[in-house]
């Protein structure tokens, strides 16, 4: 998964790689 995510954002990449905890930074909400 390094083609469409890379085009999105930097936080979206790690968010998608996470099991569910990464969904919290879906919009960059720290």
Curated annotation (Swiss-Prot):
Keyword terms, alphabetized: Antimicrobial, Fungicide, Secreted
InterPro entries from the UniProt entry: Osmotin/thaumatin-like_sf (IPR037176), Thaumatin (IPR001938)
Primary location group: secreted
Gene3D superfamilies: Thaumatin
SUPFAM superfamilies: Osmotin, thaumatin-like protein (SSF49870)
Signal peptide range: none
UniProt xrefs under PROSITE patterns: THAUMATIN_2
GO biological process, one term: defense response to fungus
Cell location: Secreted
A single Gene Ontology CC term: extracellular region
Function as written in the Swiss-Prot or TrEMBL entry: Has antifungal activity against C.comatus, F.oxysporum and P.ostreatus.
Entry's family note: Belongs to the thaumatin family.
Protein name: Thaumatin-like protein
């Amino acid at each position: 998964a390094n083609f469409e995510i890379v085009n999105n954002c930097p936080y979206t990449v790690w968010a998608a790689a996470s099991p569910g905890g990464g969904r919290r930074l879906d919009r960059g909400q720290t």
